[in-house]
């Protein structure tokens, strides 16, 4: 028997398949939710900034692997009182950048190489080299029209003043002042009265010794009259050695004849990336502030490597007094170029390498050197009384005097 719809047989009647309609509804809801989610995700992705490629490290930020093993020295006693703006220039003239600074042969006066109220002397008619008495008064000056970029200096036992003029005029500067074409890339010897006595290098022309020099950073005259010159300045900004990369020390006779050259660009022993300053201890050892490599390298006077020290930081200026106290001034350190280290003046022993004191950076709205915080000098000198002088480059300019409050 065939039972019709609605019959009372125990066999269930056939009904419409309602679960299909419910499943379709649920699918529609799910698809709608997926569409809304996709739309929202699209909005978020559209609003999100595009991912930027990782920034390249700054030029010259690399360093020797050994440096990373040294714990930064930033927290030591500071036994010095800081006196900013030491020295008053004549005629109301303002200080410019100063990195060349040295005590006079008398141990009382200080010579400073002012970059003519700016950061170069091109076109200037003032004397860049000034002699300061203990009160900061200028008692002598010279060098007008002769020195373009005083960078490092020394005073020999006869009182002669040696100046490293580290760069030549730029094309833009020469367009205005063509008469400066033959200045720079030289080491100049002046008498105590400021008369030019000797020139090493060819003015305005970088190159190789003996005829030429490339960006001489500093000059040092040994007790026997031998002359040491450190080249070159821009090497600290290089991470790879270009064909013309320069990092060298040259030794010259007292009359200016080349004796020998040692060193090369690089990160290894007896290699340099910007040998920025020179000093000599009582034993006649030559200390080289290898700034780009964040270290001191120590040599005998024939160029034999004796030791390497990292504990004095990324040094711009270096001086050693008669007691073998070493003064190392750092104007550059920051998280890129010397991670973990602060700018400042570190004082210690040239005999043992121990660092005793740390004078922190000046407060400054703008940093010196490569960045970071604060400002500190680039050149350093010490007088016979133990007063220390910093030559300032950057937002803080002129000369700073550090007066010892305690005796060692």
Task: Report the location of each language-model feature.
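Residue-identity detector for glycine
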Residues: 4-7, 22, 42
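Low-complexity, intrinsically disordered or signal/transmembrane-proximal segments
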Residues: 3, 17, 51-52
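Basic polycationic patches enriched in arginine
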Residues: 15-21, 26-28, 59
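Bacterial N-terminal signal peptides
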Residues: 30-44
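Ala/Thr-enriched low-complexity intrinsically disordered regions
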Residues: 10-13, 25, 37, 55
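Sequence-structural signature of mature extracellular/luminal beta-sheet repeat domains
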Residues: 47-408
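Short terminal hydrophobic/aromatic SLiMs and anchors at protein ends
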Residues: 2, 8-9, 15
């Amino acid at each position: 028997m065939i039972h019709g719809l609605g019959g009372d047989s125990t066999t269930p009647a056939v009904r419409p398949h309602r679960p299909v309609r419910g499943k379709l509804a649920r699918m529609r809801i799910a698809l709608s939710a997926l569409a809304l989610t996709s739309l929202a995700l699209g909005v978020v992705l559209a609003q999100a900034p595009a991912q930027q490629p990782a920034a390249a490290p700054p030029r010259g930020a690399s360093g020797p692997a050994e440096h990373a093993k040294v714990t930064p020295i930033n927290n030591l006693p500071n036994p010095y009182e800081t006196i900013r703006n030491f020295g008053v220039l004549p005629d109301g003239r303002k200080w410019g950048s100063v990195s060349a600074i040295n005590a006079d042969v008398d141990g009382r006066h200080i010579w400073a190489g002012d970059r003519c109220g700016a950061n170069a002397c091109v076109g200037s008619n003032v004397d860049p080299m000034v002699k300061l008495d203990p009160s900061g008064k200028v008692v002598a000056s010279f060098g007008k029209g002769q020195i373009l970029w005083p960078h490092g200096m020394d005073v020999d036992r006869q009182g002669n003043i040696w100046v490293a003029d580290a760069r030549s005029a730029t094309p833009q500067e020469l367009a205005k002042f063509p008469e400066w074409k033959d200045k720079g890339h030289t080491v100049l010897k002046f008498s105590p009265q400021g008369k030019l006595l000797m020139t090493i290098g060819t003015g305005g022309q970088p190159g190789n010794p003996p005829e030429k020099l490339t960006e001489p950073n500093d000059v040092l005259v040994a007790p026997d009259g031998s002359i040491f010159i450190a080249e070159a300045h821009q090497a600290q900004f290089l991470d790879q050695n270009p064909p013309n990369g320069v990092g060298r020390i040259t030794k010259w006779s007292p009359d200016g004849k080349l004796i020998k050259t040692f060193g090369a660009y690089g990160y290894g022993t007896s290699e340099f990336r910007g040998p920025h300053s020179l000093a000599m201890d009582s034993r006649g050892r030559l200390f080289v502030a290898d700034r780009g490599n964040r270290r001191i390298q120590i040599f005998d006077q024939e160029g034999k490597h004796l030791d390497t020290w990292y504990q004095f930081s990324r040094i711009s200026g270096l001086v050693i007094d008669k007691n073998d106290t070493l003064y190392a001034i750092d104007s550059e350190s920051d998280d890129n170029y010397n991670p973990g280290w602060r700018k400042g003046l570190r004082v210690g022993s040239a005999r043992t390498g121990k660092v005793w004191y740390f004078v922190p950076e000046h407060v400054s709205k703008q940093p010196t050197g490569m960045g970071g915080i604060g400002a500190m000098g680039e050149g350093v000198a010490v007088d016979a009384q133990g007063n220390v002088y910093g030559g300032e480059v950057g937002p803080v300019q002129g000369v700073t005097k550090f007066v010892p409050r305690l005796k060692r």
